[in-house]
């Protein structure tokens, strides 16, 4: 055996040993990290909803019905909670489920669907188009300014009292 072949074989053995040791070190580090993080993950549990996040979630869950921050009296089972607890107490300070969020939605009015409510909003007060006064349809800018000044209008804004 030549000395070159001996050194080449020796370096291969050293390289293999080093790779095994690095591999073991990385594996051990990974296992320790997983073990260290596991108890925190188990204790965390579901997330809570507070502030704008709670409002956005309620709007999504309740839709057009709307929602209450405190439950109306006689709405849902009240034996488990005190009278002054609301959605913030139940879903911000502790986690809550979808069923709990739905309890704070306003009840659906019988016979009205969200679509009919939307349509009704647009048809409740029909607006009549303004009719131009005969003979004054082509007023000059100066005439319009004089009319507005005589009415006490400032800055082109219309104020109603």
UniProtKB/Swiss-Prot annotation:
Keywords: Disulfide bond, Growth factor, Secreted, Signal
Region of interest: D: 107-114
Disulfide bonds: 50-92, 62-105, 91-96
Region (A) location: 86-106
Source superkingdom: Eukaryota
SUPFAM superfamilies: Insulin-like
The keyword Secreted appears for this protein: yes
GO biological process, one term: insulin-like growth factor receptor signaling pathway
Subcellular location: Secreted
GO molecular function: growth factor activity; hormone activity; insulin-like growth factor receptor binding
Residues cleaved off as propeptide: 115-161
Span list, region Disordered: 111-161
GO cellular component: extracellular space
Region annotation (B) ranges: 45-73
One Pfam family cited in the UniProt record for this chain: Insulin
Alphabetical list of InterPro entries matching this protein: IGF-I, Insulin-like, Insulin-like_growth_factor, Insulin-like_sf, Insulin_CS, Insulin_family
Region (C): 74-85
UniProt family annotation: Belongs to the insulin family.
Function: The insulin-like growth factors, isolated from plasma, are structurally and functionally related to insulin but have a much higher growth-promoting activity. Acts as a ligand for IGF1R. Binds to the alpha subunit of IGF1R, leading to the activation of the intrinsic tyrosine kinase activity which autophosphorylates tyrosine residues in the beta subunit thus initiatiating a cascade of down-stream signaling events leading to activation of the PI3K-AKT/PKB and the Ras-MAPK pathways. Binds to integrins.
Protein name (record): Insulin-like growth factor 1, adult form
